[in-house]
Amino acid sequence: MRMSAWPRTLTKSWRWHASRIFACASSVRPAAQAIRASKSYMEPKHSELHSSVDRIGRVIDQHLNVFHIETALNNRMFDGPLAFLGKREEDFTDFDRAALAGLRWTLQRTPRALRQNVFHKVPAAYGLIACAAGRTELTHEKILQACRRQLFVKVRGQADILIAGIPYISPYNVNSILNPLLVQVMACGYFFNMNRGVPLVKKGGTLIVTHPCMDEFDPVQHPSYIEFFHRLLPETRDAMTLHMKYEREFAQNPSYVHLYRKGNAYHGAHPFYMWYWGENGRQHLGQIIAVGTENTHVPELMGWERADTLAEAIDMARGRQGRSAGITLMHHPPMVMTEVALAGGDGLRQLPEHGGASAAKPGIAAKEQP
């Protein structure tokens, strides 16, 4: 969470300052190019996206007196009767196991709309674990340190097959539907990139996700997503082609502009950025399989395969990766980021970029706050 306090009175030289800022912004690569040039989204030193934003921020800091305030929250998505959902299954008590069985029984018999409504109303137990203030980049680094202590988990070796369950929520569907494009961005954009150094799955590996992939969109929040998914993806899935051929059309569409300004809709160009955000995952992975999909056309439009059960998906993945393929399950919640140690000539080696993670369990607020 980032916030900057701007000066109350802007000087007469503001126009010159603004021209410098906008000149810097205009030199930023298009998102599709910046993402392709990024080794990782979550490592600032390896991300062209971070470099672009930092460059703009430095220009602003040079000409304006910015006081930056930034905070970090804990990782507790569930509290109270649902707190057990944030545990590892091997840590479950008998009561937790009974609660999980009862929850699954209830959800299987509850209409989807009601399930979504109930879960969106369940409050998270978020709390402050760090607060820093001062100069922009120094403040941001303090908060990154707190996030690393909370999120990083050490893993030995990359997987041939990675399994991840897609949740009902993302940053872009609060009180709304997780539509197919958002399923894609969670799988190939967020979960795939939740790592430091190297991805959790090998180059050319298989990602198995579990989600019904229903062909449902919210016309109030995501109107341009509908056209993007059903009109553009049947033509091409190439991010650069989509950017060059269609992004400006969607950004300037009068209807989408009106809904963005006057309604509750995301910007008309927003679905493009959701597709770009999955670019690194699509380029790295050799196979993506969706388990339990309600249809065949949604995964096909995204270039995915489908399976009815997890066992079937694992068999399909082993057919590509080999019968001895290593399998890793990415467990959510809580949210984690992995530090993968690779086997080298002198044992295991860690790809360095930041200091190591603390021994604190993921999902527990770091005790040493910056």
Language-model features: locations:
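Conserved, well-structured core segments that form the ligand-binding/active-site neighborhood
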Residues: 1-158, 165-168, 189-193, 197-201
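A short, acidic, amphipathic alpha-helical segment used as a generic capping/interface helix at domain edges
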Residues: 138-154, 189-197, 263-282, 308-320
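Flexible loop/turn segments at secondary-structure boundaries
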Residues: 75-79, 169-173, 215-219, 296-299, ...
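Structural motif
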Residues: 160-165, 208, 328-329
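Extended hydrophobic packing segments that form well-structured cores
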Residues: 82, 89-90, 275-356, 361-370
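Short glycine/threonine-rich loop-to-helix capping motif typified by GTGT followed
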Residues: 172-184, 217-230, 303, 337-346
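Residues at the starts of beta-strands that form the adenosine-phosphate
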Residues: 65-66, 206, 287, 326
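C-terminal catalytic subdomain
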Residues: 183-288
